[in-house]
Each structure stands twice: as structure tokens, then as C-alpha cells.
Design a protein with these regions (language model features):
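Extended accessory regions or peripheral subdomains of proteins
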Residues: 1-44, 49-87, 125, 129-226
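Short acidic (Asp/Glu) patches
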Residues: 91-109, 133-146
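Short, flexible active-site-proximal loops enriched in glycine and acidic residues
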Residues: 105-113, 200-206
Length: 226
């Protein structure tokens, strides 16, 4: 755990992000139960690592309340960084993404999983065009997803819950912006996360109704469109 003196030292060393951690006693919780407690937050995710085929890795990583994002559609990039939204054209979206993400620097701390904050998301199949010029020159095909599915979408994870599957322990992390949060304010953010996941789950007993009549399924694509 970082002390106040270490926090100030890291901030003075030009680190823009300082990870603060706290191990909490959440006996009986699982990655799924922890995720259910934050699932109503904005932009959430649960990452499970796998090593060597079917063998589960050590950590389950839960992120939530992700505010910053990078969205790439064609050569148009939309960003929301520190509450400021922008949209601009880029001839090289991958370089633009690298330029944005490289602005954040954080110290390497012992006892942390390999991922404890940063950008997560997806690179769609079509994003290969940004790295391979031959693909970019191919004629574009119409797609039902084209209007609402970007080629790249990344969100910045600053608040995380790390569940250790080997030790059955829970660690919470707040990646503090050293220019916006003091040490005391960062500890208060950890307090909020701890309170959130220690809140008991409310289980509703829904009365399910048996469907009447036959169910008809319809594909979103015709065979010709596929």
C-alpha cells in the first residue's frame, strides 16, 4: 500500500497516474457476485484470464465507472478524455490511439497483477485495415452493423476490483490522476469502492410464466446477405 509520502514522491516524479490499492475482507464473494454489485455502473467489464488452454489463471479483473473512451469509425476518431469530448480525422488511427494512451504513466508496483488499469475494449475484424494497406484498398461491403458498430472502442479503467482465484482474496484499486486527486481524496475513492462491494446483493424472486403458443425465431441476416 502506498503511503502519503510515497504518493507525493511519485507525483513529483511526473507520474500522471498513481495506483492505490487496498485488500479487503469479502469472504464468500466470487467474481460473479462482485460483478453483480457494480453491474449498474457505467461501462463495466469482467476479464477472466486463461493459461494453457482450459487452466484458469490467478486473477479475475472487474472494471467499472469508466468515463474516458476512444472510438474509431473509419478514419474518424471520437474521444472523451477528462470530460472533454472531441472528434477528428486521422489518416493513421493506430498511431493516434498510441499517442493518446502514452500520455499516461504510472509506477510499477510489486504484488500487482499484470493489468491493473488502462484501456480495455475491442478491435473489430475490420480494424485490420489500419495495419494492412492492402485490406484498406479493398471495396467496402455494406453491413447492418456499420452504422452503430465502430472498428475500435476502448474505455479507460481507473476503478478496479481484483479477485485472486488462488487465495480467494479481493483487492480494490483506484488509479488516481495525480493532478486531480490528493492522497486523502484518493483514499476516499477507495472507501467508496469498498462500500459499494460490501453492500449485500438483493435477490428478487421473479415469477416466471410458461410461454404459450409456439416460438418463432428469425435471423438478422438472410442467407444471401451472409
Amino acid at each position: 500500500m502506498i503511503t502519503k509520502e510515497e504518493y507525493i514522491e511519485y507525483a513529483d516524479s511526473a507520474y500522471s497516474i498513481i495506483p492505490l490499492t487496498r485488500e479487503i475482507d469479502n469472504a464468500g464473494d466470487t467474481p460473479i457476485s462482485l460483478y453483480s454489485k457494480i453491474s449498474d455502473q457505467q461501462n463495466t467489464f469482467l476479464l477472466e484470464s486463461v493459461e494453457g488452454g482450459n487452466r484458469w489463471a490467478q486473477f479475475s479483473i472487474i472494471g467499472f465507472d469508466c468515463q474516458d473512451y476512444i472510438k474509431v469509425s473509419g478514419n474518424q476518431i471520437e474521444t472523451c478524455l477528462d470530460g472533454v469530448s472531441k472528434s477528428f480525422h486521422s489518416d493513421d488511427p493506430l498511431s493516434s490511439i498510441q499517442k493518446i494512451t502514452s500520455q499516461d504513466t504510472a509506477p510499477e508496483l510489486e504484488g500487482m497483477p499484470r493489468f491493473y488499469g488502462g484501456y480495455v475494449g475491442f478491435f473489430a475484424y475490420e480494424s485490420a485495415q489500419y495495419a494492412e494497406t492492402k485490406i484498406a484498398k479493398l471495396a467496402s461491403k455494406n453491413s447492418k452493423f456499420k452504422d452503430h458498430m465502430p472498428e475500435i472502442y476502448l474505455i479507460k479503467a481507473e476503478k478496479l476490483i481484483i479477485f485472486d482465484n488462488f487465495a480467494s482474496t479481493t483487492k480494490i484499486i483506484f488509479n488516481a490522476n495525480s493532478k486531480k486527486f490528493s492522497y486523502t481524496e484518493s483514499q476516499k475513492e477507495l472507501d467508496k469502492i469498498e462500500k459499494l462491494i460490501k453492500h449485500p446483493i438483493t435477490i428478487t424472486n421473479d415469477n416466471f410464466k410458461k410461454p404459450t403458443g409456439s416460438l418463432e425465431f428469425k435471423s438478422n441476416f438472410t442467407k444471401a446477405e451472409y
